[in-house]
Curated annotation (Swiss-Prot):
The presence of a 'disulfide through disulfide knot' structurally defines this protein as a knottin. It comes from Clitoria ternatea (Butterfly pea). GO terms for biological process: defense response. The keyword Signal applies. Keywords: Disulfide bond, Knottin, Plant defense, Signal. This is Cyclotide cter-A. There is a cross-link at residues 29-59 (Cyclopeptide (Gly-Asn)). Residues 60-124 form a propeptide. Belongs to the cyclotide family. Bracelet subfamily.
Length: 124
């Protein structure tokens, strides 16, 4: 009777291990973007995907294929581009030197946070 209870669990572990090893064999070990973003935004934004032409692509692919900065709202060449577009205040370049555009981020340094914290009045 105990073996009947263990059999489904063993099958589950076998299937989980099979999926784990299958994913490791893909490029970079992660499931690539590719879902549609017609009605909802990209679900895979946590792994670096963004919507372009109603399909989710990796951010570095969007930047590498771009001919102008206007092709995506997060593309930039300087910090001023990000500020002007309103998409952040920091333009981060990609590690690949062949990609001429960077990606806009909203970044706040600890110095600004400390400065604001020191402005607070002390009440007793």
């Amino acid at each position: 009777m105990a073996s009947l209870r263990i059999a489904p669990f063993a099958l589950f572990l076998f299937l989980a291990a099979s999926v784990m090893f299958a994913v490791e064999k893909t490029e970079a070990g992660v499931i690539p973007c590719g879902e549609s973003c017609v009605f909802i935004p990209c679900i895979s934004t946590v792994i670096g995907c963004s919507c372009k032409n109603k399909v989710c692509y990796r951010n570095h692919i969007i930047a590498a294929e771009a001919k102008t900065m206007d092709e995506h709202i997060l593309l930039c060449q300087s910090h001023e581009d990000c500020i002007a577009k309103g998409t952040g205040n920091f333009c981060a370049p990609f590690p690949d030197q062949d990609i001429k555009y960077g990606w806009c981020f909203r970044a706040e340094s600890e110095g600004f946070m400390l400065k604001d914290h020191l402005k607070m009045s002390i009440t007793n």
